[in-house]
UniProtKB/Swiss-Prot annotation:
It is an enzyme of class 5 (isomerase). The gene is murI. Provides the (R)-glutamate required for cell wall biosynthesis. PANTHER family: GLUTAMATE RACEMASE (PTHR21198:SF2). This is Glutamate racemase. It catalyses: L-glutamate = D-glutamate. It holds the Pfam family Asp_Glu_race. The keyword Calcium does not apply. It comes from Actinobacillus pleuropneumoniae serotype 7 (strain AP76). InterPro entries: Asp/Glu/hydantoin_racemase, Asp/Glu_race, Asp/Glu_racemase_AS_1, Asp/Glu_racemase_AS_2, Glu_race. The lineage of its organism: Bacteria, Pseudomonadati, Pseudomonadota, Gammaproteobacteria, Pasteurellales. Its EC number is 5.1.1.3.
Length: 267
C-alpha cells in the first residue's frame, strides 16, 4: 500500500504533522504545499481560506491522483473542511486544537491555548472548549508573531528569544497553568524554547500523533484506487521569491525530491 497524501499549510509548520504521519506510514507517497503567497493564514478572511483550499487541492489532484488530503493548519481547518468535503470524494483530515486531551491530562484544570488569532477567535474553538473543557479554565493567547518566529527558525536555525518571551509573558507568572495546547502546527517546532520559558507547565500538547493515527485508520477503511508506486515526494509553493532555493534545500532535508511552483492562476 502506497497511498498518495497531500498536506498543505500557509507555511512550513505543517511539516510537524507530515513528520508524525511519516513515522506511522513511512512508505506513503507525500506531497506538501505551502501557500506562501497567502502567508500567514491568520491574517486572511474565511472566504479567501476556502478559495485557496479548493484551488490548491483541485490543481494538485489534476496532476496527482490523491488518496487523502490533510489540512495541516489549525487556522484553515476551522473554516475549510466542509467546502473540501463537499467538493472532493477522498477523505479530508483537519487539524484542530487538542482541547479534549488537554482537559483530560491537566491536573490543575487550567489550560493555555496558544494559537493564531484566527483560531482563538473562531466559534468552532469555543464549541470545542464548551464540549470538552467545561470544567477547566482556558487561557488564550492569539499570536501571529510566533508563526513568523518559527518560519525564521526553519530558515535560519535561530529563534529571537526576546520576541518569543514577549508572546507568552502573561503565562510566565501564572500560578496554576500546567498544560499548554500548541494550537498551530508551527508551534511544536519551538516546543523546547517554550518549555524553557514556561518551566511550571508540565504538559505541552500537539495534535501530530492523533492525526497520524486518524490518517492510518481512514486509509485502512478506504479502497486505494490511486496507490502510487515509486513516486517521488514533491513539495509545492504558490509564490516564487528570493527564498525559493533556500526553501527547496529545507524541503529536501525533510525528504522531498524537489520544490515546484504551483501556479494557481493557470487553468
Amino acid at each position: 500500500m502506497k497511498p498518495t497524501i497531500l498536506l498543505y499549510d500557509s507555511g512550513m509548520g505543517g511539516l510537524t504533522i507530515y513528520d508524525a504521519i511519516r513515522q506511522t506510514l513511512p512508505n506513503a507517497h507525500y506531497l506538501y504545499c505551502f501557500d506562501n503567497a497567502y502567508f500567514p493564514y491568520s491574517e486572511r478572511s474565511e472566504n479567501v481560506l476556502i478559495e485557496q483550499a479548493v484551488k490548491i487541492v483541485q490543481k494538485i489532484a489534476e496532476k496527482y491522483p490523491l488518496d487523502m488530503v490533510v489540512v495541516a493548519c489549525n487556522t484553515a481547518s476551522t473554516v475549510v473542511l466542509p467546502a473540501l468535503r463537499e467538493k472532493f470524494a477522498f477523505p479530508i483530515v483537519g487539524t484542530v486544537p487538542a482541547i479534549k486531551p488537554a482537559a483530560a491530562i491537566s491536573q490543575t484544570k487550567t489550560i493555555g491555548l496558544l494559537a493564531t488569532k484566527g483560531t482563538v477567535e473562531r466559534p468552532y474553538v469555543a464549541e470545542l472548549i464548551e464540549k470538552y473543557a467545561k470544567d477547566c479554565i482556558v487561557e488564550k493567547i492569539g499570536t501571529t508573531t510566533l508563526v513568523e518566529l518559527v518560519e525564521e527558525k526553519i530558515r535560519t536555525g535561530n529563534v529571537d528569544q526576546d520576541r518569543l518571551s514577549k508572546v507568552v509573558a502573561e503565562w510566565q507568572t501564572h500560578p496554576t497553568l500546567d498544560t499548554v495546547i500548541l494550537g498551530c502546527t508551527h508551534f511544536p517546532l519551538v516546543k523546547q524554547e517554550l518549555q524553557q520559558l514556561l518551566p511550571k507547565v508540565k504538559f505541552f500538547i500537539d495534535p501530530g500523533n492523533g492525526i497520524a493515527n486518524r490518517v492510518a485508520t481512514l486509509l485502512s477503511e478506504f479502497s486505494l484506487e490511486n496507490s502510487a508506486q515509486n513516486k517521488e515526494n514533491i513539495a509545492f509553493c504558490t509564490k516564487m521569491d528570493e527564498e525559493f532555493s533556500k526553501r527547496e534545500i529545507i524541503m529536501q532535508q525533510w525528504g522531498f525530491k524537489r520544490l515546484e511552483l504551483l501556479n494557481l492562476s493557470q487553468k
